[in-house]
Design a protein with these regions (language model features):
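Solvent-exposed, extracytoplasmic
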Residues: 120-131, 203-204, 208-251
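Extracytoplasmic/periplasmic ligand-binding sensor regions of membrane-associated signaling proteins
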Residues: 138-221
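Extracellular/periplasmic juxtamembrane segments that couple receptor/chemosensory ectodomains to their
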Residues: 226-230, 239, 246-301
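Well-ordered, non-membrane alpha-helical segments in soluble/globular domains
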Residues: 114-125, 296
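Cytoplasm-proximal transmembrane signaling helix
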Residues: 282-327
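Short N-terminal helix-loop-first-beta-strand/juxtamembrane motif that initiates sensory/input modules
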Residues: 61-97, 127-148, 233-255
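Extreme N-terminal signal-anchor transmembrane helix of membrane signaling/transducer proteins, especially
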Residues: 2-40, 299, 306-309
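Juxtamembrane extracytoplasmic/periplasmic/luminal helical "stalk" adjacent to the first N-terminal
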Residues: 19-107
């Protein structure tokens, strides 16, 4: 005689439903755990970069102070006869020298004092930048005569100057006007710009400016265009970095992670300054990242859920109800 099953019609169905729900919860927890690890990894990388950026700014703060002393030191002046000056335009002059990686350009009148100043700055920056294989530039706006001096390591500067005008020379007047405007800001002696990109060489840099006031003359401004390619961690994209002033509402110096619209924004204060480093990640990028790194896990879980559904429906239809199907 057939013995009636002790299982009620919906018991086994509910067991498999609970099993499927458990698989879904496990999948969601795994994805959330990866998301948390992703956020922590990005924040740790940003913290590391902000620390290195703070050291870099401190270094250039010292270099700027030392450069200002060199520019105003009249005791050690190189011989003007040794300077070879090439006129690029009526107001742009290139100083050729023995330096292999540094170029000096004077914007303004071809005066001996300006050429000597450019030579001294180039010789000093050769020591600072000579061993670095990266893009860096320095603009020195002399408060005595409003002369602008450019010292740069740009690798293609000489060919551009010989055959066509460089973007560095074309933007000189804009640089001068910008530096003159910022020199009138009495409440700000130090200014850091947002991160910019030079697309032809895929270079990311920011501008660091320091103002120096001396009695009897206009403000002298030293401006560095500093490359950060060597500071960017491998798991971060330079296109998504920004530098802005620290909000007044931020009372602590701790890093923060916040959602603004569909963007996840990581932030970390730059020690020794009133600025903050930000990194933006879009929701779309996070979704693709999470799915891409968990594709096989999700595939396996979905296959298990699919087979569990098939078995649950088969048992409910064939083995539980009606009992006559079991004969």
């Amino acid at each position: 005689m057939y013995k009636q099953s002790l299982l009620k019609p919906n018991t086994l169905f509910r067991i498999f439903a609970a099993f499927i729900l458990l698989l879904i919860v496990m999948l969601c927890l795994s994805l959330f755990n990866y998301y948390q690890a992703l956020v922590q990894s990005r924040q740790a990388s940003l913290n590391s970069m902000a620390s290195r950026l703070a050291y870099q700014i401190e270094d250039y703060r010292y270099q700027a102070s030392h450069i200002y002393k060199i520019a105003n030191n009249k005791s050690s002046t190189p011989s003007a006869d040794q300077l070879a000056v090439t006129g690029i335009r009526h107001d742009i002059f290139w100083l050729s020298s023995a330096n292999q990686s540094i170029d000096a350009i004077v914007f303004g009148n071809n005066k001996q004092s300006s050429n000597v100043l450019a030579s001294k700055l180039a010789n000093y920056m050769e020591i600072v930048w000579g061993a670095r294989n990266e893009y860096n530039s320095m603009y020195y706006l002399n408060g005595l005569d409003n002369t602008l001096v450019l010292v740069t390591t740009h690798s293609i500067l000489k060919p551009e100057l010989r055959f066509k005008e460089s973007y560095l020379t074309l933007t000189a007047e804009e640089k001068r006007a910008d530096m003159l405007t910022q020199s009138t800001l009495l409440d700000r002696r130090e200014i850091i710009s947002n991160i910019q990109k030079y697309s032809p060489d895929n270079l990311f840099y920011y501008t660091y400016r320091l103002m120096f006031n001396s009695p009897g003359q206009l403000t002298s401004v030293i401006s560095f265009d500093i490359s950060i390619n060597s500071l960017i961690p491998p798991n971060l994209n330079g296109d998504f970095f920004t530098i802005n002033t620290r909000p007044a509402s931020t009372g602590s110096n701790e890093p923060h992670t916040t959602w603004v619209g569909t963007n996840l924004i990581f932030s970390h204060p730059i020690d020794g300054t009133s600025y903050q480093l930000y990194y933006h990640v879009s929701l779309k990028s996070i979704i693709f990242n999470v799915i891409g790194y968990n594709l096989w896990l999700m595939t396996g879980m979905l296959i298990m859920i699919f087979f569990a559904l098939l078995i649950m429906l088969f048992i409910r239809k064939r083995l539980i109800s009606p009992n006559t199907n079991m004969l």
